Structures are given as C-alpha cells and as structure tokens.
Amino acid sequence: MDNIHNHKILILDFGSQYTQLIARRVREIGVYCELWAWDVTEQQIREFNPTGIILSGGPESTTENDSPRAPEYVFDAGVPVLGVCYGMQTMAMQLGGLTEGSAHREFGYAQVDLQATDSLFAQLNDDLDSAQPKLDVWMSHGDKVTRLPEGFQVTGTTPTCPIAAMSDEKRHFYGVQFHPEVTHTKSGLALLTNFVVNICGCATNWTPENIIEDAVARIKAQVGDDEVILGLSGGVDSSVTALLLHRAIGKNLHCVFVDNGLLRLNEGDQVMEMFGDKFGLNIIRVNAEERFLDALKGIHDPEAKRKMIGKVFVDVFDEESHKQTSVKWLAQGTIYPDVIESAASKTGKAHVIKSHHNVGGLPDYMKLGLVEPLRELFKDEVRKIGLALGLPAEMLNRHPFPGPGLGVRVLGEIKKEYCDLLRKADAIFIEELYNSGWYYKVSQAFTVFLPVKSVGVMGDGRKYDWVVSLRAVETIDFMTAHWAQLPYDLLGKISNRIINEVDGISRVVYDVSGKPPATIEWE
C-alpha cells in the first residue's frame, strides 16, 4: 500500500465557521489533510512538508493593522496555494495587492462570471445556457480585493465584487472570494478537486480500506505484543476503536463495558451480543448500576450530576484496569475535531474553542501509554471505517447519546424508578419514528423524564402519575436547531402507546423549543 500520508494538504485556519468543512471536503476527495492555526512557524510547515496549502476564511478584516497573516514561508514553499475568502484577501495583501472594506457586503447566494479559464476553474460551468461560464456560489464577506498583486489576473467577477477570483498560474497561487467548501456552491467539490488533485498532484488514496490498513499497521508498531485496555461504551467512536485494535492485536485487547444503569432499553445486552458474541472481543461487563445510583442520591444540579457520573466511571474503570496487571496501554476514541479544539495557538490570537476531555493525557496515577487510532479522523470518516469493519449501519447512524446517558434526561435527582420508566417510553418513541420513516429525517430524538406528577384518568378512576416530554430536532451542525414538525397523528400514536404501555406515566408533551434560545438536551 502507498503511504496515505505522503501527499497531504495543509489548511491554515483563520477562524471561519466553515474551516472544518474544507478539511472534510479534501478528505472526501481522497487526500489527507491537517488543519492548523494560522500562526504556525516556518519550521512546522517545513516538517509537515505539504503538497499544497489552503488559507481559510475568517471573521477578521485585512484592513486592520493587527489582522492575522499567513506565515511568509507559505508563499516561498514552492507549493500551490489556494486562498478562500479572507485567505484570498490576506494573500493579495501579503503579495503586494490592496484590500478595502466594501459598502456592498455579500452574504449568501451569488453568481460569479468566469473571466478566464485557469487550472482551478477547468471544466467548471453551472450555467450551460450562457455563452460565458458562470458559477453558483456562496459568499460571506465584507472586505474585498481592489488591486491585484503582480503576476495575478482576474478570473471571476460579480456585480458588486470586481475581483471575485484571481490566479497566478506561474506560481500556482489562486484566490476565490466565495466558499467552495459549502454545499451551496454547486461546483465547490469539483473546484477543490481541481486544486488538490490536478494542480497539487495529490494521489487519492485516503480511503476507508487504506485507512484501516494504515491504522492496524501503526497500532502493531506502537504496542507490539503489549496488552491494551479500552473503555467500550457501545458508541460509534469507542466501537470503531475496539474493532481496529482487535484486528491489530486480537486477544491482547481488554474491553471494559461499564453498565452504569443510565443506558437505553436493553443497550447493555446489545453491546455484549454485538462485541462479545458477534465479533469475539475480549470484553468485561461491569454491572455498576447500584454504585452510580447510590452516588447520585440527593444530587439535583445538572453539572454536579455530570461530574459525579464522570468520577464514578473513572473509579470503576480504574479498579478494573488494576485487575488487568499486564496491561501497558490505554486506548481512547479521540477523533480529529477533539484534537483541533484542543490545539494551542502560538500567538493566542487564533480561535481555540475548548479543551476536550479526551485530549491532554491521562490521570497521573494511570501509568499507561496512550493509543488513539482515530485521532486523525472526522466523525463521518469514523462511520465509514466502522461500516468497512462490519458494524451495522443502523448502529453507526444512530442519533447522538450524551456521555452521562439518562443522567441528563431525568431532570433533577436520578432514581432507578425514573430511569426504568424513561427507558420504556423512549424505546416506544424511537420505535415509532423508525416505523413511520421519520427516524432519519430528524437529527436527534429522545424522551425526557419530568419529576412532576399530573392527574390522569384510567378506567373509572383518577390517578397521579409522571410526565415525559418528547424532543425531536432538525439541525445541520447542532449549533442551532429547529424542533421537528412531526405529524400530529404520529405524535398521537406515540402518546397513546406510552400512556397505555408504560405503567406510571399519565401525560406526554412535545417540546417545541428551538436552539437558541433552548439547548437540545434539557440539562
């Protein structure tokens, strides 16, 4: 197999909300890439040795004195460079052109008239009826380039942006004022393919099969004949991590499945059946429900509940790891967005989002090496790897489930009675979404237990029982979300089933809050 890291694109992040999309598109094309803060050093770029460089968009203005700049070495490295939005503007400024703020800001759909067909725009045209090639694109900018650097030509214009694209074919420098990475730019993926494959000359060998082969080889090289321990939750990341490690080291992998009593209906049995029986993994099930529930008694605050659940998990996992006296490595399902969010910026100006729980090493008392076979992969890539390894699609494409599980879906204090009722109600909700074809139309759906009683009528009698709320949302990025407009007859069917089949629930409500102002989870 060819080295899948041999050809690679470096993406410098200037803070755009779309920057990770650039990386995902390049990976989709079949080429490895990494995303770094814009203020990297020349030495770091030299060591990475990119085949091409992409400068992302960003929220700053190139007209400000302290605005971010690409390292000068970017333009001296002898590799093709593509500037996107802010990336085009800083390229123009740094190479001797001019930018200025515009009275006509462009946000949303625009049509670019192609003035010259350079290598970047080869074979691209979204308007076949026009004598002049045009591209349907997505704009999001205030500043614009007003004077080209020496050696550049205008390759695209819009009515309000005379220099919407530019190129210097001799040095293979290209700039586009629009965002090719978003799906609204119709030929965006084709444009990026032109840059990455045709201009940079990258081989498209970043495929699930090659990634698996590479990961297995690297695991073997890292751990050799040593034994590895992994906390297996049944979620996508830990499941794919488990199967990669199992393929590489077989029975030297010890999986610990901590059943905390906060899982979905029959989930513990399903995990054991899938990974123990079907895939033959060496897996230990720790039934810790009583321990978790005891620790959570009297705790009502959501953050305090999260912390306690995390603490008890670490304690239980640590006890199990000490029983495996020959284990030398801990495996984690860290994925690439975790690594990006935790990357430190040299100047402190780059936009670093948060510190992530999977990144930054282990507790001091755990004297184990760290194995992270997914740390180069985006979530969609992890799912593709899982599919190639034999995991069922319905498991890989399941809606997100929070780390604390039902601990944040039972409001207030957590009790076994509440969890048992919630499990049954939620299973009915999800089953009916599947049966009606709505499960994959919504981004996330779940049930919340409300610790209040409401009067109900059953037969000839009145009784007070608990209330649950159904929640279903539609979202692209989980940063904002709309409540899903499920059909009334479907909601009615779900409500009737829950009230009739789950003894202890007398009322079902539907949450019609968007994000913002509400969050997706209730706690």
UniProtKB/Swiss-Prot annotation:
This is GMP synthase [glutamine-hydrolyzing]. It catalyses: XMP + L-glutamine + ATP + H2O = GMP + L-glutamate + AMP + diphosphate + 2 H(+). InterPro entries: Class_I_gatase-like (IPR029062), GATASE (IPR017926), GMP_synth_C (IPR001674), GMP_synth_GATase (IPR004739), GMP_synthase (IPR022955), GMPS_ATP_PPase_dom (IPR025777), NAD/GMP_synthase (IPR022310), Rossmann-like_a/b/a_fold (IPR014729). The gene is guaA. The active site is at 85 (nucleophile), 179, 181. It comes from the Bacteria. GO terms for molecular function: ATP binding; GMP synthase activity. Keywords: ATP-binding, Glutamine amidotransferase, GMP biosynthesis, Ligase, Nucleotide-binding, Purine biosynthesis. One of its GO terms (cellular component) is cytosol. Signal peptide: none annotated. Catalyzes the synthesis of GMP from XMP. Residues 206-398 form the GMPS ATP-PPase domain. Pathway: Purine metabolism; GMP biosynthesis; GMP from XMP (L-Gln route): step 1/1. It is an enzyme of class 6 (ligase). ATP binds at residues 233-239. It comes from Actinobacillus succinogenes (strain ATCC 55618 / DSM 22257 / CCUG 43843 / 130Z). The keyword RNA-binding does not apply. Its EC number is 6.3.5.2. Homodimer. Residues 8-205 form the Glutamine amidotransferase type-1 domain.
